[in-house]
């Protein structure tokens, strides 16, 4: 009987991932809960691109980032006070959250400028580039990536070419596309910061301060380059509320819940589907369309993103 349980465990989780099993509940049931939670999370994130795009008709990019991250931070801040932690963990969480939040704020502002000048589908797919960029940045700081990463990086660039470069034109990229690519670079840095701090700090303080710091970046741009309008804020209330509460506070919490129950490879694969959902929502709700050339680029880029996350052992077995 014990042997059968071990076989069942190994069939669900790769070797070394048994710790993902919870103390209570059937492993299949817990794993399915994680899959469902992460699929819902990716849908929430993908719909945020719609919120970002529609909000631009009412308020400026910096104002949207300020309101969005401020709302996310305020939603999570009570949990920081409720969860007990040492003063050292609290200080580390605040410091790490502030540093990460600055990068998050810059990435969010630049992304908003990009969304304003390109389609939702393009913005989502180009943002996914951070999954390829993270291992490359790792090489710069001394973490040698697998050889397949270089192949995936080149393949992703080919995909970007077909998505962003119009047929019959010289090698030029639209301004909106450049904003999104720069945004993906910053998101790659932000994700690496999260990986550095997450095991060393109090998560509740870290996440709430990260959002609040990000909102301050948006506030600076808002004060210097944009004008406040109560009517514009009122008109953009729903997109701001969705991005701040659902995409920020709720989705990040669901991601944490899901990744406690899933192996990292599966979780990453599920999260990469955000771009696909975003393209669908742009077509359904905003009347956007992707031409054959751009769809081909999206397919190539999806292959690169997915292949980059498959472990060597899994590919050899297949």
Where are these regions (language model features)?
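C-terminal-most transmembrane helix of multi-pass membrane proteins
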Residues: 2-3, 8, 14-15, 19-23, ...
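Hydrophobic transmembrane alpha-helices of multi-pass small-molecule transport proteins
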Residues: 76, 145-165, 184, 218, ...
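Hydrophobic alpha-helical transmembrane segments of multi-pass integral membrane proteins
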Residues: 32-37, 63-78, 95, 148-155, ...
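Glycine-/small-residue-enriched transmembrane alpha-helix faces in small-molecule transporters
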Residues: 2-63, 102, 106, 110, ...
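Specific transmembrane alpha-helical segments of multi-pass solute transporters/efflux pumps
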Residues: 44, 48-49, 77-127, 162, ...
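Helix-helix packing/entry segments at the starts of transmembrane helices
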Residues: 67, 109, 123-129, 194-215, ...
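C-terminal transmembrane-helix exit sites in multi-pass transporters
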Residues: 75, 80-84, 130-151, 276-295
